[in-house]
Amino acid sequence: YEKTKHTVQARLLDNPSRHSKLIYFKDLFNEKIDLKKIHDLEIMYWDVFIKSTQIDKKSIKLLINRKENKDFYFLFTNQNTNIQLRKINSWGLNFFDLVITSEEVGFEKPDKKFYDYADSYVAAKVKKMDTKIYAVGDDYRNDIKFWQNKYNARSYLIDNKKLEPLSSNTSVTDSTGESFDV
């Protein structure tokens, strides 16, 4: 699976479909099992992933309870729109005012074209009212850096390896192996 995943990701380097588990399974099992079973594998993969993922319910409750009418929650993500909406609804995260996926933009974070598209929505809200920007994510370069540079956003970087949030005054290593003081 991992070898096929890396092959697909190399082939679809700048394409949001590079995260498609369906494409991984299709390439992995091509001519070995029928297409229905390949499709069923993808469904089973996401069913198990969604059910087994542990969501910090305390943090979710805090986000929901602290959200006021003037607050806007945006989610910008590299993944298939269908899968992201499935995860959002299954995990009780249906409080975002706007969700933008790389699939619908045609570019992935950290591509500037992705941020330009997402920022057109953020900039419109910032212009209308006195707004504070908070960037939350598990990858500094993908989730936080742009928003800090453009809006001096406060950040909250989540370390998935430790499953604990890191304070914004921490040195971290992102998925590329690059270290940053945040």
Where are these regions (language model features)?
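A metal-dependent, Asp-based hydrolase signature
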Residues: 3-44
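Short histidine/acidic/glycine/proline-rich micro-motifs that form metal-
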Residues: 8-12, 50, 104-106
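Soluble or luminal CAZymes and related metallo-dependent hydrolases
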Residues: 17-21, 51-58, 110, 114, ...
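Short, acidic loop-to-helix structural element flanking the phosphoryl-transfer center
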Residues: 19, 43-74
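Alpha-helical elements of Rossmann-like donor-binding domains used by nucleotide-donor carbohydrate transfer enzymes
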Residues: 23-27, 61, 65, 113, ...
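Hydrophobic alpha-helix position signal
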Residues: 28-30, 66, 88
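Short glycine/proline-enriched coil/turn segments at helix->beta-strand junctions
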Residues: 30-35, 68-71, 93-95, 151-152
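Asp-based, Mg2+/Mn2+-dependent phosphohydrolase catalytic module
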Residues: 79-182
